[in-house]
Amino acid sequence: SYGRQIGDDDSHYSERRIFAKYYPAVSQIPQEGFFCNNANSALLRSVWTSNVFDEELTGLEDMELAKRLVRAGHRVAYVAEAPVFHHHQESWPQVRRRFEREAIALRAIMPEVHLSRIDVLRCVLESTLGDWRSAKRNGIKSSSRLDMLRYRWNQYVGSYIGNHEHRVLSRRAKQKYFFPETSKDTDQDEWLKSVRRPPAHEG
């Protein structure tokens, strides 16, 4: 099982929208598929002793493990009631490299997923416009429009670099893992509104 991840006003707003897409407010127990994240997760000791992370991967080792477990008959649960703040304090080159590493790993996990240059342009445009609309709707002042564009550019250019080899295209898989969320329900997530986590000593 794994829990919800959220950001606050110290996070890039674009990343907060990514969290809202992958970590919605409603639990799924069990969920479909093998998406998960080990930043906030739990696994039976008996399962872990015989199923460990693939340390050769450049990222997404949690998803790769979940894929193996689902194939073996296990199930993955998403628990929205167990949230954590997840922050990335990164420069723009670091943002790009993180998405590049994840895309390289995704090639090993889902080799049918391919991102073209046209996909990159479409994703950058649609995601950035979506960020701008959502930020205006939620009264966000902590991230500038330029920063949202920069984030999305580095996100998708990094993903393209890591996923540049031509592969059999699965439109459904590509839509799920690369394309921006367009649901109005997602943009109404309470954690997309202006908020900042309290200092640790305040509980």
Predicted regions and their residues:
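Short beta-strand-to-loop element that shapes/binds the nucleotide-sugar donor at the catalytic cleft/hinge
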Residues: S1-Y13
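Short aromatic-enriched loop/helix-cap "lid" or pocket-rim segments at secondary-structure transitions
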Residues: D10-R17, Q89-W92
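Short glycine/proline- and charge-enriched loop/turn segments
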Residues: I18-S27, T49
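Nucleotide-sugar-dependent glycosyltransferase catalytic core
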Residues: L57, F85-A108
